[in-house]
UniProtKB/Swiss-Prot annotation:
GO biological process: canonical glycolysis; symbiont-mediated activation of host plasminogen
EC class name: isomerase
Reaction(s) this enzyme catalyzes, per UniProt: (2R)-2-phosphoglycerate = (2R)-3-phosphoglycerate
Knocked-out gene: effects: RNAi-mediated knockdown results in significantly decreased enzyme activity on the outer surface of the worm. No effect on motility, morphology or viability during culturing for 7 days.
Name of the featured protein: 2,3-bisphosphoglycerate-dependent phosphoglycerate mutase
Site residues, Transition state stabilizer: 184
Family to which this protein belongs: Belongs to the phosphoglycerate mutase family. BPG-dependent PGAM subfamily.
Protein backbone atom coordinates (compact mmCIF):
# COMPACT_ATOMS: atom_id res chain seq x y z
CA UNK A 1 0.00 0.00 0.00
CA UNK A 2 1.16 3.55 -0.76
CA UNK A 3 2.40 5.64 2.19
CA UNK A 4 -0.64 7.94 2.10
CA UNK A 5 -4.25 7.85 0.99
CA UNK A 6 -7.02 10.42 0.60
CA UNK A 7 -10.67 10.01 -0.38
CA UNK A 8 -12.68 12.56 -2.37
CA UNK A 9 -16.47 12.58 -2.72
CA UNK A 10 -18.52 14.96 -4.82
CA UNK A 11 -21.71 15.74 -2.91
CA UNK A 12 -24.85 13.78 -3.73
CA UNK A 13 -27.20 15.14 -6.36
CA UNK A 14 -28.59 18.55 -5.39
CA UNK A 15 -32.00 19.98 -6.18
CA UNK A 16 -30.27 22.19 -8.77
CA UNK A 17 -28.51 19.14 -10.28
CA UNK A 18 -31.91 17.46 -10.49
CA UNK A 19 -33.35 20.52 -12.26
CA UNK A 20 -30.23 20.80 -14.48
CA UNK A 21 -29.50 24.32 -13.24
CA UNK A 22 -26.17 26.06 -12.69
CA UNK A 23 -25.64 26.03 -8.94
CA UNK A 24 -22.23 27.46 -8.00
CA UNK A 25 -22.28 29.20 -4.62
CA UNK A 26 -26.09 29.01 -4.41
CA UNK A 27 -26.82 26.94 -1.30
CA UNK A 28 -29.01 24.27 -2.91
CA UNK A 29 -30.09 21.32 -0.79
CA UNK A 30 -29.70 17.63 -1.61
CA UNK A 31 -32.43 16.01 -3.68
CA UNK A 32 -34.00 12.73 -2.60
CA UNK A 33 -31.63 10.96 -4.98
CA UNK A 34 -28.73 12.94 -3.50
CA UNK A 35 -29.54 11.71 0.00
CA UNK A 36 -29.56 8.14 -1.32
CA UNK A 37 -26.21 8.70 -3.07
CA UNK A 38 -24.66 10.15 0.09
CA UNK A 39 -25.77 7.18 2.18
CA UNK A 40 -24.55 4.75 -0.47
CA UNK A 41 -21.15 6.48 -0.52
CA UNK A 42 -20.84 5.88 3.20
CA UNK A 43 -21.93 2.27 2.78
CA UNK A 44 -19.31 1.72 0.06
CA UNK A 45 -16.60 3.10 2.31
CA UNK A 46 -17.74 0.92 5.21
CA UNK A 47 -17.89 -2.20 3.04
CA UNK A 48 -14.33 -1.50 1.87
CA UNK A 49 -13.12 -0.99 5.46
CA UNK A 50 -12.27 2.70 5.18
CA UNK A 51 -12.04 4.85 8.28
CA UNK A 52 -11.10 8.49 8.78
CA UNK A 53 -9.49 10.76 11.34
CA UNK A 54 -10.57 14.12 9.93
CA UNK A 55 -12.86 15.50 7.23
CA UNK A 56 -12.93 18.69 5.17
CA UNK A 57 -15.87 20.17 3.32
CA UNK A 58 -17.27 23.45 1.98
CA UNK A 59 -19.73 25.82 3.64
CA UNK A 60 -22.51 24.75 1.26
CA UNK A 61 -25.22 22.49 2.68
CA UNK A 62 -25.23 19.94 -0.16
CA UNK A 63 -21.63 19.03 0.68
CA UNK A 64 -22.06 19.34 4.46
CA UNK A 65 -25.14 17.10 4.46
CA UNK A 66 -23.43 14.56 2.20
CA UNK A 67 -20.54 14.41 4.64
CA UNK A 68 -22.93 14.00 7.56
CA UNK A 69 -24.68 11.07 5.88
CA UNK A 70 -21.32 9.46 5.05
CA UNK A 71 -20.03 9.83 8.60
CA UNK A 72 -23.29 8.47 9.96
CA UNK A 73 -22.94 5.32 7.85
CA UNK A 74 -19.37 4.93 9.14
CA UNK A 75 -20.30 5.70 12.76
CA UNK A 76 -17.70 8.48 12.66
CA UNK A 77 -19.89 11.45 13.60
CA UNK A 78 -17.35 12.36 16.27
CA UNK A 79 -14.31 13.06 14.07
CA UNK A 80 -13.21 16.70 13.54
CA UNK A 81 -14.76 18.44 10.53
CA UNK A 82 -13.44 21.66 8.99
CA UNK A 83 -15.78 23.68 6.77
CA UNK A 84 -14.17 26.23 4.47
CA UNK A 85 -15.31 28.52 1.67
CA UNK A 86 -12.14 27.52 -0.18
CA UNK A 87 -13.73 24.16 -1.02
CA UNK A 88 -16.93 25.78 -2.35
CA UNK A 89 -18.10 25.04 -5.87
CA UNK A 90 -16.92 27.34 -8.62
CA UNK A 91 -18.97 30.56 -8.65
CA UNK A 92 -20.92 30.56 -11.93
CA UNK A 93 -21.67 34.28 -12.03
CA UNK A 94 -24.74 35.34 -14.00
CA UNK A 95 -25.37 31.69 -15.00
CA UNK A 96 -26.32 30.69 -11.45
CA UNK A 97 -29.91 29.49 -11.33
CA UNK A 98 -30.25 29.13 -15.12
CA UNK A 99 -31.21 25.83 -16.72
CA UNK A 100 -28.20 24.35 -18.54
CA UNK A 101 -30.13 22.91 -21.48
CA UNK A 102 -32.09 26.13 -22.00
CA UNK A 103 -28.85 28.11 -21.82
CA UNK A 104 -27.31 25.76 -24.42
CA UNK A 105 -30.33 26.23 -26.69
CA UNK A 106 -29.95 30.01 -26.39
CA UNK A 107 -26.16 30.39 -26.59
CA UNK A 108 -25.08 27.10 -28.22
CA UNK A 109 -23.68 23.95 -26.68
CA UNK A 110 -20.08 24.94 -27.43
CA UNK A 111 -20.40 28.26 -25.59
CA UNK A 112 -21.98 26.54 -22.58
CA UNK A 113 -19.22 23.93 -22.59
CA UNK A 114 -16.66 26.75 -22.55
CA UNK A 115 -18.42 28.45 -19.64
CA UNK A 116 -18.75 25.14 -17.77
CA UNK A 117 -15.40 23.57 -18.52
CA UNK A 118 -12.84 26.00 -20.01
CA UNK A 119 -9.91 26.54 -17.71
CA UNK A 120 -9.55 30.31 -17.94
CA UNK A 121 -12.81 31.73 -19.35
CA UNK A 122 -15.37 32.76 -16.68
CA UNK A 123 -19.09 33.25 -17.29
CA UNK A 124 -20.48 36.80 -17.15
CA UNK A 125 -20.27 38.18 -13.58
CA UNK A 126 -23.15 39.05 -11.26
CA UNK A 127 -23.49 42.59 -10.00
CA UNK A 128 -22.90 43.09 -6.27
CA UNK A 129 -26.53 44.24 -5.99
CA UNK A 130 -27.73 40.91 -7.43
CA UNK A 131 -29.29 38.59 -4.81
CA UNK A 132 -27.08 35.83 -6.24
CA UNK A 133 -23.90 37.67 -5.18
CA UNK A 134 -22.45 35.69 -2.22
CA UNK A 135 -21.41 38.88 -0.44
CA UNK A 136 -25.08 39.38 0.46
CA UNK A 137 -25.14 36.16 2.54
CA UNK A 138 -24.44 36.09 6.31
CA UNK A 139 -22.13 33.07 5.99
CA UNK A 140 -19.56 35.23 4.19
CA UNK A 141 -19.87 38.30 6.43
CA UNK A 142 -16.42 37.77 7.98
CA UNK A 143 -14.73 37.01 4.67
CA UNK A 144 -12.71 39.83 3.11
CA UNK A 145 -14.73 41.30 0.24
CA UNK A 146 -11.78 40.78 -2.13
CA UNK A 147 -12.18 37.00 -1.65
CA UNK A 148 -15.86 36.90 -2.61
CA UNK A 149 -16.20 36.18 -6.34
CA UNK A 150 -18.71 37.66 -8.77
CA UNK A 151 -17.79 34.88 -11.21
CA UNK A 152 -15.04 32.28 -11.53
CA UNK A 153 -13.36 30.14 -14.14
CA UNK A 154 -11.63 26.91 -13.13
CA UNK A 155 -8.30 28.74 -12.98
CA UNK A 156 -9.78 31.04 -10.32
CA UNK A 157 -11.09 28.00 -8.44
CA UNK A 158 -7.65 26.36 -8.51
CA UNK A 159 -6.11 29.52 -7.08
CA UNK A 160 -8.74 29.52 -4.32
CA UNK A 161 -8.51 25.83 -3.44
CA UNK A 162 -4.78 25.11 -3.58
CA UNK A 163 -3.73 27.30 -0.62
CA UNK A 164 -6.00 25.15 1.56
CA UNK A 165 -4.37 22.02 0.16
CA UNK A 166 -0.86 23.26 0.89
CA UNK A 167 -1.59 24.88 4.25
CA UNK A 168 -4.02 22.40 5.77
CA UNK A 169 -4.89 19.20 3.91
CA UNK A 170 -1.35 18.15 3.03
CA UNK A 171 -0.28 18.71 6.64
CA UNK A 172 -3.06 16.38 7.79
CA UNK A 173 -1.95 13.71 5.34
CA UNK A 174 1.68 13.99 6.42
CA UNK A 175 0.58 13.52 10.02
CA UNK A 176 -0.74 10.17 8.74
CA UNK A 177 -4.32 11.18 9.38
CA UNK A 178 -6.87 9.41 7.20
CA UNK A 179 -8.45 12.32 5.31
CA UNK A 180 -11.89 12.58 3.70
CA UNK A 181 -12.83 15.52 1.49
CA UNK A 182 -16.47 16.06 0.49
CA UNK A 183 -16.75 18.95 -1.92
CA UNK A 184 -17.97 19.90 -5.40
CA UNK A 185 -17.36 19.07 -9.04
CA UNK A 186 -15.06 22.00 -9.71
CA UNK A 187 -13.26 22.30 -6.37
CA UNK A 188 -12.44 18.59 -6.74
CA UNK A 189 -11.40 19.10 -10.38
CA UNK A 190 -9.05 21.81 -9.11
CA UNK A 191 -7.42 19.43 -6.63
CA UNK A 192 -7.22 16.58 -9.14
CA UNK A 193 -5.73 18.89 -11.78
CA UNK A 194 -2.94 19.70 -9.35
CA UNK A 195 -2.39 16.12 -8.17
CA UNK A 196 -2.39 14.59 -11.66
CA UNK A 197 -0.65 17.57 -13.29
CA UNK A 198 -3.47 17.66 -15.84
CA UNK A 199 -3.06 20.16 -18.67
CA UNK A 200 -5.35 23.16 -19.02
CA UNK A 201 -6.85 21.62 -22.17
CA UNK A 202 -7.33 18.09 -20.82
CA UNK A 203 -9.09 19.27 -17.65
CA UNK A 204 -12.01 20.40 -19.85
CA UNK A 205 -12.95 16.74 -20.38
CA UNK A 206 -12.77 15.65 -16.73
CA UNK A 207 -16.17 14.99 -15.18
CA UNK A 208 -16.65 13.82 -11.59
CA UNK A 209 -19.82 11.89 -10.73
CA UNK A 210 -21.89 12.65 -7.64
CA UNK A 211 -21.73 10.43 -4.59
CA UNK A 212 -19.06 7.90 -5.66
CA UNK A 213 -15.92 7.82 -3.47
CA UNK A 214 -12.70 8.50 -5.39
CA UNK A 215 -9.56 7.12 -3.72
CA UNK A 216 -6.09 8.54 -4.35
CA UNK A 217 -3.01 6.69 -3.11
CA UNK A 218 -0.01 8.99 -2.73
CA UNK A 219 3.73 8.47 -2.40
CA UNK A 220 5.99 10.07 0.22
CA UNK A 221 5.98 13.34 -1.76
CA UNK A 222 2.15 13.30 -2.00
CA UNK A 223 2.30 12.44 -5.70
CA UNK A 224 -0.38 10.01 -6.92
CA UNK A 225 0.61 6.39 -7.51
CA UNK A 226 -2.91 5.11 -8.12
CA UNK A 227 -6.51 6.30 -8.09
CA UNK A 228 -9.84 4.52 -8.42
CA UNK A 229 -13.56 4.87 -7.75
CA UNK A 230 -15.29 2.58 -5.27
CA UNK A 231 -17.76 1.38 -7.91
CA UNK A 232 -17.69 -0.83 -10.99
CA UNK A 233 -16.66 0.68 -14.32
CA UNK A 234 -20.15 0.63 -15.82
CA UNK A 235 -21.65 2.49 -12.85
CA UNK A 236 -18.90 5.12 -12.95
CA UNK A 237 -19.13 5.54 -16.74
CA UNK A 238 -22.91 6.03 -16.60
CA UNK A 239 -22.60 8.57 -13.79
CA UNK A 240 -19.88 10.50 -15.63
CA UNK A 241 -21.99 10.53 -18.81
CA UNK A 242 -24.88 12.08 -16.90
CA UNK A 243 -22.60 14.91 -15.76
CA UNK A 244 -21.16 15.43 -19.25
CA UNK A 245 -24.63 15.66 -20.82
CA UNK A 246 -25.91 18.38 -18.50
CA UNK A 247 -24.83 21.22 -20.77
CA UNK A 248 -26.46 19.91 -23.94
CA UNK A 249 -29.65 20.96 -25.66
CA UNK A 250 -32.66 18.69 -25.23
Amino acid sequence: MAPYRIVFIRHGESVYNEENRFCGWHDADLSGQGITEAKQAGQLLRQNHFTFDIAYTSVLKRAIKTLNFVLDELDLNWIPVTKTWRLNERMYGALQGLNKSETAAKHGEEQVKIWRRAYDIPPPPVDISDPRFPGNEPKYALLDSSCIPRTECLKDTVQRVLPFWFDTISASIKRREQVLIVAHGNSLRALIKYLDNTSDSDIVELNIPTGIPLVYELDANLKPTKHYYLADEATVAAAIARVANQGKKK
